[in-house]
């Protein structure tokens, strides 16, 4: 029996799709020094190679791929999209606008000057900004019929040029941004580490790394005479055991009676106390407070310690500093704060935003009470709310199909923007109502990554047939344009942030990488600053940038049509 694998690939879109995906994802795992190629580049380049070899993709799977991707982008941005308008929000929005407008106008100018056409211009913009949402927005603006194409304009040719321009400039945009944010502080004669420490002092932040061990442990001690003398009749609140040791007094046994103390309780000699704290805190406890003998008492130690992720929701907490929650008095331990999928600097003085996720450890009932005060405990479920997912998906398509007519001018959002807005709404509602629209993080990541990968396969296969011709004709010009669109908007944004917005350079560079939605570049800034402080800036611009980038893709096509 003879199997002609090449013929099978030509005959089966499904087989071709997953073969390209498999090879592309393998290529994405390749590392060149500290640089990993990544799934997007790997899949796109593999698809271009297969397209150049004559393989074609005729299925409509591409549409499902880009719609899934952009909808999931909206869900991720939703919890924090409206919170951007709080502290420093206007700075982040303005900075994002300046960077994207500079990139948009520069791309249009270069494309007009070099006569590259709308498709190549949109591809250069999306690739140089490493923004797939911009590419999705541009392609959807054409496919949705919202634009009146000039007579004899070949839509497929314009779409293919988008894919080629994106492929040629994506790597330039990624590596270029990483190099710019790495060496710009040196050129500006700035010590980014010092700047990060400066903003930390100004805002009362610290930059301690998250603990390696998140779950506290329980140990029990009998209070000896030295500790009792040191306490001297003071209450637990007055002695400040937690600030000194990191341990919290969870239970006291006195004269055989168990009690759960509050801040007004007084420890006496002979009491047996159950302390909850991280292992390193217990290790230091005897030295600091000269406790008596450690005891084993099953009833005293019978506590259920849990670690939960609490979503910030309640208006009375949003906008306040974490320290105001008085976690120590509530017997709860903060492990980390996550905002827009980015772990924030480990500090209790961070201002809380709606949708922030606090990982908290402590006794089960105490953690539950804290969650009721600030929001809700994230659902521990692997089941997706498919009813909400499909309903909001349909809503996005309906929003995208609406067109407004003003005389001879017809205006509509298109599927990309409609799905993005519907995703934002679903994500926002999820941050406010724990039972609405729950999608497990793993499922959301799968849908987003798979949708993006399928979209890249289709784009690459369709554009691959003409990539060598374009490389020989305009390859150098496209790469040159990509370098300019990568670097100049960043420089303009940096100068605007320093001179006009008066932003701290560490926060500013983090915000610039967020405006470009480029997490690898943020890692470079964090490394240069020897701090995670820049992540605050990244989270400030990331959510709104996803929306603006999608719109930018639509707008650049509108310059021509």
UniProtKB/Swiss-Prot annotation:
| Gene Ontology annotations of biological process type | potassium ion transport
The entry's localization annotation reads: Cell membrane
Q: List the membrane topology term(s).
A: Multi-pass membrane protein
| Keyword presence, Transmembrane helix | yes
A molecular-function term among this protein's GO annotations: monoatomic cation transmembrane transporter activity
User: Please, which domain of life does this record's source organism belong to?
Assistant: Bacteria
Task: Cite the Gene3D superfamilies for this sequence.
Answer: Regulator of K+ conductance, C-terminal domain
Where is the chain membrane-spanning?
Answer: 8-28, 37-57, 66-86, 90-110, 161-181, 386-406, 409-429, 450-470, 476-496, 541-561
Cellular component, GO, one term? plasma membrane
UniProt keyword DNA repair present:
no
Q: Which Pfam families match?
A: Asp-Al_Ex, TrkA_C
Stated family: Belongs to the AAE transporter (TC 2.A.81) family. YbjL subfamily.
Q: What is this protein called?
A: Putative transport protein ASA_2308
Provenance organism: Aeromonas salmonicida (strain A449)
